[in-house]
């Protein structure tokens, strides 16, 4: 069986059914045609991200995506600064 890939937006919207709209995990999983353990993982990830915890998996919320991009950019700039300091 081929593994299905879901977009971050789909994961977020699916998890929001449970977190924001008070669906049960089982009902949301059935409505979105995903496994119960998959839905449980997405709900946990969304709740963690909303509490400000750094996700171990791919980020769900747009804010977490932006934070990840900014952290990478900051790391690159800091590395460039270190290289320039050594040259001077």
From Swiss-Prot:
GO terms for biological process: DNA transposition. This is Putative transposase InsN for insertion sequence element IS911B. Keywords: DNA recombination, DNA-binding, Transposable element, Transposition. One of its GO terms (molecular function) is transposase activity. The keyword DNA-binding applies. The keyword DNA-binding applies. InterPro entries: Homeodomain-like_sf (IPR009057), RD_transcriptional_regulator (IPR051839), Transposase_8 (IPR002514). Involved in the transposition of the insertion sequence IS911. It comes from Escherichia coli (strain K12). Belongs to the transposase 8 family. Gene3D superfamilies: Homeodomain-like.
